[in-house]
């Protein structure tokens, strides 16, 4: 490892630990893992863990495993397994040949559970789940021993084998570790190792009738895979003594160590998998990849580039204490990434027709437009200009306030890449609604500059009516209105304006020809991405993130 990579690796306390372990000789190589449970789609919080675990392996020349913690078949589906693999790859990481499943180790875990029984460190408990919960005690009161705690090992082994064989119904018995019912850490009060669950497993089918708990499977899976640094979020800090107890009391092949970091919390966002599942099942969103969802699939469908997520995770860093990050930090990272790469296009979301009265009827011309102002390699495109165009409704005001510089009666403005125009007449319907504008243009200003040097204070985008392409545009906002939504009452805090669907938008023809997977900037509007709902003759765009609205700031300041 070079000095430069060493410096890069020392950005956070976990990388400092890894660097120290290598320097001291505790480990000769580094192995990390990302171990999702396949009971839902990955979200922003997972992105932080993915970047950390794969990033550590990359920084230190090690490897990172992708392991599915598939120990609860009642909630796990192949759909989630497939989606997780897609999302990790999309984020930019590759596990190579190191794809594993906790179910790969079911036989070994069963054998180790038998070992604990023979050692007098595990027993079969016939109490109900509620009886076990009530006997566990509280933070201030010790728990009570189960009446089955002192069962002979032979009887426990027999019952455990019969549990595996499927002789008993769900919930009839569990296997518990025999540790200390008076332990200050409640996780050490004889935790459950196995429960009976008659359910079809996505990989093992109906072979098993018992399944290991997360706590029992996790550390031992780490050991089997020779994980050196088992990195997880802070809610597992109280589980570390149990993680260590299993490793200390089993003949495991290696000794991993668990380290915890702060989980990701973001304003206007809930990352609870329970909440996300209820949002989908309750019909509050249109699926796991709804662009309002904080899932990686949702962010991808919204048009967020993977590099923006990686940069966001890098900026928030790795801390030991939980905190909440403003969602604006994510938006900033998205804008930065898209500003570098997105081609510029013109799109009118709320069209207002403009007739240029002194432009020759039946005539049109091609103008040259720049695809990216800071990236000459993207080249230029040709756009057509004619007598009738569309502009944004909000770019015209009949009686403008002092600091409004866009089009109004008698005012001259610049049309992007085209000409100066001046509004001469406002055409309205009987209700007083503006139907169209009658304007004139200055032929000498072709390209957007006046030969006499006169200046205008506004440049507006437009689309030629003759070749404009209709489109639907979906404007997405925060899914939750409140900055710190309450997971317990999330439904009451949903934002009823989290999506606005605009039909009848008009966009330039290049947008129909662009690659479907390419992000674009609608000039003066924001960054957009073609949605998978698009079809021949039907363009649909999702707003990824908006641009800064300077007029909104001025209006707010003056109100």
From Swiss-Prot:
EC class: ligase
UniProt entry tagged with the keyword Transport: no
Compartment(s): Cytoplasm
GO CC, alphabetical: cytosol
Residues bound to ATP: 37-39, 43-49, 233, 263-264, 271-273
Catalyzed reactions: tRNA(Gln) + L-glutamine + ATP = L-glutaminyl-tRNA(Gln) + AMP + diphosphate
Source organism superkingdom: Bacteria
Motif ('KMSKS' region): 270-274
Main location class: cytoplasm
One Pfam family hit: tRNA-synt_1c_C
Alphabetical UniProt keywords: Aminoacyl-tRNA synthetase, ATP-binding, Cytoplasm, Ligase, Nucleotide-binding, Protein biosynthesis
GO biological process terms, semicolon-separated: glutaminyl-tRNA aminoacylation; glutamyl-tRNA aminoacylation
MF (Gene Ontology): ATP binding; glutamine-tRNA ligase activity
Family membership noted in the UniProt record: Belongs to the class-I aminoacyl-tRNA synthetase family.
Name of the protein in question: Glutamine--tRNA ligase
Organism: Nitrobacter winogradskyi (strain ATCC 25391 / DSM 10237 / CIP 104748 / NCIMB 11846 / Nb-255)
């Amino acid at each position: 490892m070079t000095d430069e990579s060493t410096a890069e690796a020392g950005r956070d306390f976990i990388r400092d630990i890894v660097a120290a372990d290598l320097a001291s000789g505790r480990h000769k190589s580094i192995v990390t893992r990302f171990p999702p449970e396949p009971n839902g789609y990955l979200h922003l919080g997972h992105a932080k863990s993915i970047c950390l675990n794969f990033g550590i392996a990359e920084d230190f020349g090690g490897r990172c495993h992708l392991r599915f913690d598939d120990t609860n078949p009642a909630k796990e589906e192949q759909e989630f397994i497939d989606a997780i693999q897609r999302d990790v790859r999309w984020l930019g990481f590759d596990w190579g040949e190191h794809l594993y499943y906790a179910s790969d180790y079911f036989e070994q875990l069963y054998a180790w559970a038998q070992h604990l029984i023979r050692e007098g460190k595990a027993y079969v408990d016939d109490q109900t789940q509620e009886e076990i919960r009530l006997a566990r005690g509280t933070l201030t009161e010790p728990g009570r021993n189960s009446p089955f705690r002192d069962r002979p090992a032979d009887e426990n082994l027999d019952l455990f084998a019969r549990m595996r064989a499927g002789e008993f119904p769900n919930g009839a018995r569990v296997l518990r570790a025999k540790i200390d019912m008076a332990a200050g850490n409640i996780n050490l009060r004889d935790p459950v190792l196995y429960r009976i669950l008659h359910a079809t497993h996505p990989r093992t089918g109906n072979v098993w009738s018992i399944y290991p708990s997360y706590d029992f499977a996790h550390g031992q899976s780490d050991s089997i895979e020779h994980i050196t640094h088992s990195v997880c979020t802070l809610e597992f800090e109280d589980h570390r003594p149990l993680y260590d107890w299993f490793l200390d009391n089993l003949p495991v092949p290696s000794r991993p160590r668990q380290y915890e970091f702060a989980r990701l919390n973001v304003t206007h966002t809930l990352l609870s998998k329970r909440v996300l599942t209820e949002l989908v099942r309750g019909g509050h969103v249109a699926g796991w990849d709804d662009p309002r969802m904080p899932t990686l699939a949702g962010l991808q469908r919204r048009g967020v580039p993977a590099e923006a997520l990686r940069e966001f995770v890098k900026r928030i860093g790795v801390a030991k204490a939980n905190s909440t990050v403003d969602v604006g930090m994510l938006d900033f990272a998205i804008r930065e990434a898209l500003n570098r790469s997105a081609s510029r296009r013109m799109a009118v979301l709320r069209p207002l027709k403009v007739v240029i009265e002194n432009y020759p009827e039946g005539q049109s011309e091609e103008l040259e437009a720049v695809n990216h102002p800071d990236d000459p390699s993207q080249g230029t495109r040709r756009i057509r200009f004619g007598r009738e165009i569309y502009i944004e409704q909000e770019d015209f005001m009949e009686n403008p306030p002092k600091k409004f510089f866009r089009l109004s009666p008698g005012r001259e403005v610049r049309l992007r890449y085209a000409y100066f125009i001046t509004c001469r007449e406002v055409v309205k319907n009987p209700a007083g609604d503006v139907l169209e504008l009658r304007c004139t243009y200055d032929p000498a200003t072709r390209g957007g500059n006046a030969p006499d040097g006169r200046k205008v204070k506004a440049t507006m985008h437009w689309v030629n009516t003759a070749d404009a392409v209709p489109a639907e545009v979906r404007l997405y906002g925060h899914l939750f209105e409140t900055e710190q939504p309450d997971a317990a009452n999330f439904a009451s805090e949903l934002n009823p304006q989290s999506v606005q669907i605009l039909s009848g938008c008009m966009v330039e023809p290049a947008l129909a020809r662009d690659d479907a997977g390419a992000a674009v900037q609608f000039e003066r509007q924001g960054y957009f991405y073609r949605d998978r709902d698009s079809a021949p003759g039907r363009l649909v765009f999702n707003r990824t993130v908006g641009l800064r609205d300077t007029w909104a700031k001025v209006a707010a300041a003056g109100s």
